[in-house]
Amino acid sequence: MLKSYIAFDVETTGLNPLENEIIEIGALKVRNGKVAERFMEFIKPTTSISPAITSLTGITNEMVAEARPRCSVVADFLDFCEDDVLIGHNVSFDYSFMKCSAAADGLSFEKMGIDTLKIAQKALSGLESKSLGSLCEYYHIENKSAHRAYHDALATAKLYQTLAHYFEEKDPKLFKPIQLTYKIKKPQPATPKQIAFLNNLIRKKRVKLSWDPDTVTRSEASRMIDDLLKG
């Protein structure tokens, strides 16, 4: 079992790291098996948080209104991580968002990691659900605030220690850190239909937007359309 690592989790506005944003990062730095430092911070998104995300996470637009922008928070988190191994539950999801966020500001985020979800899928194949909540319930691990980044990260650290206690000796390869990978896809240009619809909305709403139809991406156009429709 690793004695030093970082367990982390992010809360986001959706599932696509190229189109959605991180709104909260939670992490704990473990040294010699004990929590040595904590990282908990909101990020102010460029778009409003949907009611569905608020219902899931409890994070409201008011809670992030005074938060720092992505570039500042992500840079601080990268410094916090140092050279540590990252541990997460479905860590590829959290890593994909962190990598895209870092890349957007010209920063590199290359990490080794351990995924408690993958460990559980192999070691506990008989369990119907391998979600963090289900595994915490199975092992009686308390998670005071599920779907909030720091509390999920803390629960993940406890789950990792529990799984290592029961299964690492039987299958040590399952617990070895691997290189985390995520290939950032090149943004796709907005479709002619999106541009036409966006122009029509701008005329109807009588608003002024600073945008270039020749360079706007598909995801940016979708976000602008959503914001105009909500308004």
Short names for language-model regions:
Residues 12-14, 118, 155:
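Short, glycine/acidic-enriched loop or turn micro-motifs at the edges of active sites
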Residues 148-161:
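Acidic, divalent-metal-coordinating active-site segment for phosphoryl/phosphodiester hydrolysis
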Residues 161-231:
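Acidic two-metal-ion nuclease catalytic site recognized across multiple nuclease folds
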Residues 111-123:
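A short, structured active-site edge motif that brings together acidic residues
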Residues 1-111, 125-147, 173:
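Conserved non-catalytic scaffold segment of RNase H-like nuclease domains
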